[in-house]
Amino acid sequence: VVTSVPVLAADTVVQAGETVSGGTLTNHDNQIVLGTANGMTISTGLEYGPDNEANTGGQWIQNGGIANNTTVTGGGLQRVNAGGSVSDTVISAGGGQSLQGQAVNTTLNGGEQWVHEGGIATGTVINEKGWQAIKSGAVATDTVVNTGAEGGPDAENGDTGQTVYGDAVRTTINKNGRQIVAAEGTANTTVVYAGGDQTVHGHALDTTLNGGYQYVHNGGTASGTVVNSDGWQIVKNGGVAGNTTVN
């Protein structure tokens, strides 16, 4: 786990107690935030690819640091270390946020959010071709998923929508949205609307299907699912469903 970054001569450091506003990071620039950074645009940091520990550029939010209203464009990286917090980040396609601290109200417009062990993401909105990956030991709450199911029912498209290896709580899945709950993952209190679906290889608790679909695969368990009008629960060979209510 990376908790610090070497301070090079070309780096910009926002010291504790200091507030900066505006600016753009390009061409391997670093901004190391111990204070508060508002309204930054980040266009560098992913030179070695998504979620790669070798990446060194971009914006680094350290313990006690805060970043608000950040824009992350293609190739840009916002890294939030343990004890750091960010809010209202917008991430375009090709950009990413690596999260070990806290993030509130992130919008993924084709971008990616990787929530690592100890990280907490609240209120993320995942739009077309965006992806939220919740790793083991991480938590995402109140996520809205608007992408992932464009390939059709029960077609796992890879890195779009929401993939849960840790814990997802109170996720809303809208039309074209998909939540994939991996074998080690748990999804609690998910609501799935028409045109969206939940694919379960791990554990799904108290899912409500308001016209949406739930696929429980081999090894997956679904408990307390409520199937409302036009909803559909499909329990495959080796899958388990208990305490289902069909309306």
What are the residue ranges of the model-derived segments?
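Short, intrinsically disordered, charge-balanced linker/junction segments flanking boundaries
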Residues: 243-247
